[in-house]
Amino acid sequence: MGKAKRTGARRQVHKAPAGASGGPAKTNPNPFEVKVNRQKFQILGRKTRHDVGLPGVSRARAIRKRTQTLLKEYKERNKSNVFADKRFGEYNSNISPEEKMMKRFALEQQRYHEKKNIYNLNEDEELTHYGQSLADIEKHNDIVDSDSDTEDRGALSAELTASHFGGGVHKNSSQKEGEDGDKPKTRKELIEELIAKSKQEKRERQAQREDALELTEKLDQDWKEIQILMSRKPKKSEDKEKKEKPQPDEYDMMVRELGFEMKAQPSNRMKTEEELAKEEQERLKKLEAERLRRMLGKDEHENKKKPKHTSADDLNDGFILDKDDRRLLSYKDGKMNIEDVQEEQSKEADGQENDQKEGEDDSEEEDESHEDSEESEDPDSHSDLESNIESEEENETPKKEQRQTPGGKLPKDDQKAQKAVAAELPYVFAAPESFEELKFLLSGRSMEEQLLVVERIQKCNHPSLAVGNKAKLEKLFGFLLQYIGDLATDSTPDLKTIDKLVVHLYSLCQMFPESASDSIRFVLRDAMHEMEEMIETKGRAAFPGLDVLIYLKITGLLFPTSDFWHPVVTPALLCMSQMLTKCPVMSLQDVIKGLFVCCLFLEYVSLSRRFIPELFNFLLGILYIATPNTKSQGSTLVHPFRALGKNSELLVVSDKADVTTWQRGSLPLHWANRLSTLTATEANHTRLSCVASCLSLMKHCVLMYQALPSFHAIFRPHQALLSKHLADCSLPQELQELAQSILSAMEGQKQHCRPLVCEKSKPVPLKQFTPRLVKVLEFGRKQGSSKEEQERKRLIHKHKREFKGAVREIRKDNQFLARMQLSEIMERDAERKRKVKQLFNSLATQEGEWKALKRKKFKK
């Protein structure tokens, strides 16, 4: 079949040139332009429509068609031969005529100023002046005033025409008229005429003023007559006017109130941290100098001269020279040398001024900080009225002899005052360079004095005062930590002082967070190393001392505990978890330490609500050792607790008398350091207090973790101990009520997740007797459930094919228009280049002619 077709095609090709039918002869296509779409398989009955194609012919046909249609529309895009009424709002009755005119004017101006093609640089804007083109104005010699309303606008006047184009006739005629008429006035005549005009104007103004006065007097008389008539009216009108007076508005009242309000007075600017630190340091230095002066027994008024009482018959002959101010007369270069005298006098004057300033400062400081010392003095000492009965020997003795030597004995009152001053705290402290120096400064002092010493150390060594103060305060943080540890490890730990020192630790931590975090990490690392070494050597580790517990408490106060990861808090959490899992509970002291660590855990995770499994394990162990040992308790214990053994019933109370006498109270923290020997009753009371603390912590955990999906799975062991075993124990009524409230809170929580259950086996379906008919379709055909579905798929396929064809044609149209636009741009550029070249040629020709003419002139 294929060969037959090919032979037939060949015959047709040979027969084509012969025009036997009389029609036009068909041209044979170029074989290189023919594209044959070869098919892999010949299928009988299938009609092939696009097996042979001519791409060049089809492309030329498409270009010719676009030239006849699309190019024609593109060239006529700005042409219009149909009159369309495009006036704004012409057929809109809702707009007033004024609004229509305004909007039309705006659109006209907008259309006038907008460029048709923003990329066409050859398109210039037409410049206008008062609505008239500048090109038209430049053609006229005279600029016509736009404000003139004459009908002959732009026309030349007759005088101007006669003066410019009269040929001199206008000038001669004006001269003749001047000769025939009066002669021009002289300067004297002009001045007399000006004076006469000014006098005439003055007379007219005087007449107008007199007329105005007469009218005013007449109006005054008329007003008096009318006023008499108005005064005779009844009082009802006045009452009505009073009633009709408007009440003051709230706004007016508010404005008046604001007008009378006191205005804020400007205050001094706020001082920076550096300025405040400098002022505080200066104040402490002055106070320290005052303290040292009082400690040495120096009188503050010894340099001041006491006023002496002079009698009426005093001859004022008691004048004594304080010092011999006589000078040796000397000459230099024939002149008296007085420079030394002037210099000494100036120095003495400066010294007196400084003494006065220091005295003023000392008096201010004494008024502020030493009120007690002032109160001790007698206000009515009458020092200004002391008698002048003093021996001449005392007046003649110099001041050095009056003062006592340092080795001399002081009076008893002075000795007591000196001892009190010596016991007073200094105001200036140097930063300690070692822990021993800090301990020497703080040891033996009360809590208030220790806090005051630390505060003054910080103020005197503020980082803004000197360069090295930052390193000193960073060391101070570590020394304070070590000092707190020493206070905690004493036999009677001073917890109040530790609590107050935490405030200074917090301020130092805010100033130097990096060094503070390094110091606390170092302390926690040492505690963990000690615990690991003890586990390696002994196989188990004891709970750390009270100092480590206080360090963990301070860590939670100084640093944020809600962060996902923190360089200090995260190691602290790990340290606490290691304590609860690796330190066995051997005594009541260990129970107290473990409960304190549980409290710290809850404080750390109060915001983040992070799940801590070690916490629940330890609380479960505490509840377990508070119940008697039985075979099955519904829970499994994890290290460090044991189900059976020596300490498996550590918190069990068997004496009912102790149960009845127990009163709930908080566990003292100093018991964690050292638990003194207790009696049996005190030990049982301590056990019950531990159980109460455990139950309160359990209730707090229930409220915190109630939103967890695994809530019931976590608290199931605790619930079993509380409901079955702890209820059987003889506990106080208060603890039983607390346990019941915890159980009710657990049972009241909804179960957020369902436990996994094995899938049940599927039921065996019943046998169906109705056969299932399946339509067997040919391979490769598009299958559909119904005719409607098949029609829908056919339309979707057709739409997709047509859409692709439309996109292809639009893309080709855009390419065609782009080629046309590019050709236009190239034509315009070529035309512009041609004109520019022509201009350059003409200019070159002109320049050549001018140079030739110039050379010709030079030759002549």
From Swiss-Prot:
Query: Which GO cellular component does the record give, naming just one?
Result: small-subunit processome
> Which residues fall in a compositionally biased region of kind Acidic residues?
358-378
Keyword line: Nucleus, Phosphoprotein, Ribosome biogenesis, rRNA processing
A GO term, aspect molecular function: snoRNA binding
Q: For bias kind Basic residues, which ranges apply?
A: 1-14
Q: Low complexity composition bias: which ranges?
A: 16-25
Q: What is its main location?
A: nucleus
Instruction: Please give the residue ranges the record annotates as the region Disordered.
Output: 1-33, 161-417
One Pfam short name: Nop14
Q: What is this protein called?
A: Nucleolar protein 14
Q: Which organism is it from?
A: Mus musculus
